[in-house]
Amino acid sequence: MYSAISEKISETITLQRQTSSRYIEFFVFRNVDINELWTTDISEDKTHDVWPAVNKKSFKKFLENELTSYQRPIPLLGIPQNGTVSKTCKKEKQRETDCVNYERKHGNPVTFYPRHRAKRNANTDTCISEEPSILVSHHRNSKMDVFMDTNKITLVNRELIWVPHDQVRIVKLDISLYIPDGFFGVITGHSNDVFCECVTEIITDETDISVFLMNLSEHSLMLLPGDVEFSINFLPCYIPEPWEMINLSPPEFAIFHLKASREFIAKPNSYTIQYFDAMYVCADELKALMIPSKEIAKLGLLIETYIWNKDTIPSIKIFNSTRKTIYIPTGICIARIIFTCGHFCLSLMPERAINRLQVLDANSSFLFHYATSNNA
């Protein structure tokens, strides 16, 4: 058995041969070039900090003739060997077929935005993971301008947005996304008007994406073009094992739901903090992102996004932006939870009702496929 720890990602790669079936197994989770396996020598004074030396010819011959190889989906960073996966990893040819089928169906060409990064592959029969590929379909009659960076999508309103007083405005972004397996998107928004709050949203594979705008003032708001900006960042998701979760129900499409264990009330124009008897004991690199549920947002309750760390119980900060007392019954979903290895922080906003979530993963890159659509 050979075992090494990559200097790039601090993940273990194991090559194991079983005499019965001559089976070899390896796991690659991020930027890993398999060719380094047989190009780097290991000395006695170094203990598992570089790749081991392997005979290239004999190893390739073994792969081609006497081996059934399997590679776990690369986007699922750190997932246990017997963990639960909500989606399957598609082959590169299948992703190309999806783009061709989309063009035939909608009659619109697909624009490619290449990103330069080394390929990660093992052998021709395994799932080859290229740049994470994201298909963006922008409706022609959209009220949003779309800008694509190396690692995120930015949307800015190009028309007026009316936000009524004491109501929640649901704004359609007029885009559809095809997110690759093992990834999810998080939408963060910012408005130039201090009385307008944008509710953070998470998406997995959406065709009708919308966000919530809350009016905290005593009169209606008219947001001018360019006043609202939404950023969609993409991060790898993770599904913990059942024994790593305490008092959490099974997930739906990698998303857990945090429900109220007891009833409570939210007084008008005031804050309340609710604690929940839940905990998780996953790896240190993982954290849970708690996003307000749509049921709570429709009631006019503003929930601050919470970064939930391991071995702690979550607390939710709720602000009632209405002028009436809101009763929250037992069992209603307060927040949605998704586990990731991404990096976040809460930017302090003294002039705002809640702090703003900021995604710090700026080094990741994606391959965006852009197309226009005639859908309304």
From Swiss-Prot:
Q: Which Gene3D superfamilies match?
A: 2.70.40.10
Q: Which InterPro entries match?
A: dUTPase-like, dUTPase-like_sf, HSV_DUT
**Keyword annotations:** Hydrolase, Magnesium, Metal-binding, Nucleotide metabolism
Which GO terms are recorded in the biological process aspect for this UniProt protein?
A: dUTP metabolic process
The terms under GO molecular function for this entry are: dUTP diphosphatase activity; metal ion binding
Instruction: List, separated by semicolons, the cofactors it needs.
Output: Mg(2+)
Ranges annotated as spanning the membrane? none
Q: Is the keyword Magnesium assigned to this protein?
A: yes
Please give the catalytic activity noted in the UniProt record: dUTP + H2O = dUMP + diphosphate + H(+)
- Please state the Enzyme Commission number of this protein: 3.6.1.23
| Similarity field | Belongs to the dUTPase family.
Q: What is this protein's function per UniProt? A: Involved in nucleotide metabolism: produces dUMP, the immediate precursor of thymidine nucleotides and decreases the intracellular concentration of dUTP to avoid uracil incorporation into viral DNA.
Instruction: Spell out the HAMAP family in the cross-references.
Output: HSV_DUT
Q: What is this protein called?
A: Deoxyuridine 5'-triphosphate nucleotidohydrolase
Q: What is the originating organism of this protein?
A: Human herpesvirus 6A (strain GS)
